[in-house]
Amino acid sequence: MRISLNKYKIFSNAKINIGLNVFQKESDGYHNIDSIMAPIDLSDEMDVTFYSDLGDLKIECSDKSIPTDERNILYKTYKIFFEESKKEKEKIDIILKKNIPSEAGLGGGSSNAGFFLKLLNKHYGNVYNEKELEKLAMRVGSDVPFFIKNKTARVGGKGNRVDLVENNLKDSIILIKPLDFGVSTKEAYESFDNLKEVKYADFDKIIKNLKEGNRIALESNIENSLEQGILETDTNIKMLKMTLNSVVSGKKFFMSGSGSTYYTFVTELEKSQIETRLKTFVDNVKIIICKTIN
């Protein structure tokens, strides 16, 4: 018989990449990156129940396309935490309600993992300090350490360097996620590896623009290495970008992470009009309005 010990409801938010530089593959098969990641107020919900008896992790998910067995990143998080902490495994149930789209470049899975890892640490008496938790998170996935701090940050290396930056942007963000296709991270990096020339974002300028809250200047400095590769190989992405540029002329659209989500910054005055145009003239996409969490 399962006796419930503690119940928690946690909200694990998404992120956007405000620029992403990817560098040539290292000898270990991985790429170093340089990026500004900013948390946004679009969140998954996790109801987590700890039981008093020993056992394993059980996951239920609202999105039936997401595996709930050992392939789920929450399982990896659970396994690594208990292996490292030497705590006895308790039975834990997670009911996961997905609001962050998959294959979107918004860090949904990494966010779930980061917030679950923080909850495990808290539940067991803060076994690790923040720095130690970031190192543990790195073993789960390269975007997971960012969600330990969960503040706008410059992320470097293979995701292991997370340095906070000041973000004074006041604009809203419109996310555009295609419904009938996504981009796998593997596909994105393979496309990047075949690029002959890469245009890089200037993060010194981006950091200055964020501090000043200067969206116009910021937009002129954003580049995404993975997008440049994907636009060469993925017809769906190429058509989506062309459609966005033609439907809302004069606005700049940026890919987050490895895609397939695009986003644009909007003022309060233009938000409603641009949202309406996108919903009217761009087929098979989900439109989400959000803001960065500063």
UniProtKB/Swiss-Prot annotation:
Stored SUPFAM superfamilies: GHMP Kinase, C-terminal domain, Ribosomal protein S5 domain 2-like
Signal sequence bounds: none
Superkingdom in the source lineage: Bacteria
Coiled coil: none
Gene3D superfamilies documented for this protein: 3.30.230.10, GHMP kinase, C-terminal domain
Keyword list, A-Z: ATP-binding, Isoprene biosynthesis, Kinase, Nucleotide-binding, Transferase
Pathways involved: Isoprenoid biosynthesis; isopentenyl diphosphate biosynthesis via DXP pathway; isopentenyl diphosphate from 1-deoxy-D-xylulose 5-phosphate: step 3/6
Protein's name in the database: 4-diphosphocytidyl-2-C-methyl-D-erythritol kinase
Organism: Fusobacterium nucleatum subsp. nucleatum (strain ATCC 25586 / DSM 15643 / BCRC 10681 / CIP 101130 / JCM 8532 / KCTC 2640 / LMG 13131 / VPI 4355)
